């Protein structure tokens, strides 16, 4: 088990050795709290966008279903006639310059896997830059937009925001509720009291402190041809090689089991690079991966390689709440 996997296991299941990391946790907490205090006091260079900015982020390390929810937000806003843009850090991207506009024809090496997925799925204007403020400025210089979604960036306080949505894995929760490196939290748990909405991925119903949403398998898509098949394409009991290089790969493997397949699990690090050799598994079986992994594998995909497309389904209460926020943030003329 890799060191990162052992640490993740300790955060969520407990380990006495984590006590040794508490002095570093105290230092980390002071740094992040100082950043937030400066932001609240209006100190430093903080960019206020002329159009509303909605941050979709995490307070924990690891995957929470953020990208599918962003895809849902894009399409929901578009159905209301809104022009939406996205900014992202572009983790792992190696563009020739920053900021960099992501196009559907780019490689994942150039664009980053999550930004490329978003552009290929939605065709939305998307700019990557670790400096989210600079990304927003570049996006607005090239596009007329009504709303900007910030992919992650909850802790990027140089960009002012109008709405903060924080996602939490309903099954794993906040682990031991301690900050890095003694726990999985990027900011102290008290930070959740100041965000606009919490969304619990996998919750059966809305909670007193937040909304439920779930990820629903939508289709199997062939990497080579783009052919779409229903999720019952494989017979119950079918063995498949399951590949996931995401923040919480076990959630993906569990999803395949709910479809009554028998996945042979191959977990990789989040944003891991792939090659044909790395994915040359035995025995020879169909291979199913996440859509995020697929954008890195199309160039060398084999005929029986598929990705599972998933759609975010937020609760009706969240949809109504979000529409109310849009009415508050946007001029009435922009909304139907």
From Swiss-Prot:
Pathway(s) annotated for this protein in UniProt: Glycolipid biosynthesis; lipid IV(A) biosynthesis; lipid IV(A) from (3R)-3-hydroxytetradecanoyl-[acyl-carrier-protein] and UDP-N-acetyl-alpha-D-glucosamine: step 6/6
Transferase among keywords: yes
GO BP, sorted A to Z: lipid A biosynthetic process; lipopolysaccharide core region biosynthetic process
List of residues binding ATP: 60-67
One of the record's GO cellular component terms: plasma membrane
Leader sequence residues: none
Molecular functions (GO terms): ATP binding; tetraacyldisaccharide 4'-kinase activity
Lineage: superkingdom: Bacteria
EC code: 2.7.1.130
Catalysed reactions listed for this entry: a lipid A disaccharide + ATP = a lipid IVA + ADP + H(+)
Keywords: ATP-binding, Kinase, Lipid A biosynthesis, Lipid biosynthesis, Lipid metabolism, Nucleotide-binding, Transferase
HAMAP family with a match to the protein in the record: LpxK
Role played: Transfers the gamma-phosphate of ATP to the 4'-position of a tetraacyldisaccharide 1-phosphate intermediate (termed DS-1-P) to form tetraacyldisaccharide 1,4'-bis-phosphate (lipid IVA).
NCBIfam families, sorted: lpxK
Family: Belongs to the LpxK family.
Annotated protein name in UniProt: Tetraacyldisaccharide 4'-kinase
Source organism (scientific name): Pseudomonas fluorescens (strain SBW25)
Gene name, Swiss-Prot/TrEMBL: lpxK
């Amino acid at each position: 088990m890799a060191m990162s996997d052992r640490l993740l296991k300790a955060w969520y299941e407990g380990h006495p050795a984590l006590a040794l990391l508490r002095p570093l946790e105290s230092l980390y907490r002071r740094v992040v709290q100082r950043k937030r205090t400066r932001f609240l006091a209006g100190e430093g260079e903080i960019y206020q966008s002329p159009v509303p900015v909605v941050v979709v982020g995490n307070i924990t390390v690891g995957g929470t279903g953020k990208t599918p929810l962003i895809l849902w937000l894009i399409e929901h806003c578009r159905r209301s006639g809104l022009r939406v843009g996205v900014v992202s850090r572009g983790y792992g991207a190696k563009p020739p310059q920053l900021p960099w506009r992501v196009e559907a024809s780019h490689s994942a090496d150039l664009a980053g896997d999550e930004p490329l997925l978003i552009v290929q799925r939605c065709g939305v204007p998307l700019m990557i830059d670790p400096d989210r403020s600079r990304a927003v400025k570049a996006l607005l210089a090239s596009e007329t937009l009504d709303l900007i979604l910030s992919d992650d960036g909850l802790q990027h306080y140089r960009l002012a925001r109008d709405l903060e949505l924080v996602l939490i894995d309903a099954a794993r929760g906040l682990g031991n509720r301690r900050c890095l490196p003694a726990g999985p939290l990027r900011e102290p748990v008290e930070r959740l009291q100041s965000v606009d909405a919490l969304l619990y991925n996998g919750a059966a119903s809305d909670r007193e402190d937040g909304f439920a949403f779930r990820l629903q398998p939508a289709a199997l898509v062939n990497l080579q041809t783009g052919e779409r098949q229903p999720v019952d394409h494989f017979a119950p009991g079918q063995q498949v090689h399951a590949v996931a290089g995401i923040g919480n790969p076990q959630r993906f493997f569990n999803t395949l089991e709910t479809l009554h397949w028998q996945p042979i699990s191959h977990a990789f690090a989040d944003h891991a690079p792939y090659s044909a050799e790395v994915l040359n598994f035995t025995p020879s079986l169909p291979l199913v991966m996440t859509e995020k992994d697929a954008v890195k594998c199309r160039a060398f995909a084999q005929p029986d390689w598929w990705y599972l497309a998933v759609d975010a389904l937020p609760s009706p209460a969240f949809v109504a709440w979000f529409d109310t926020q849009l009415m508050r943030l946007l001029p009435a003329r922009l909304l139907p």
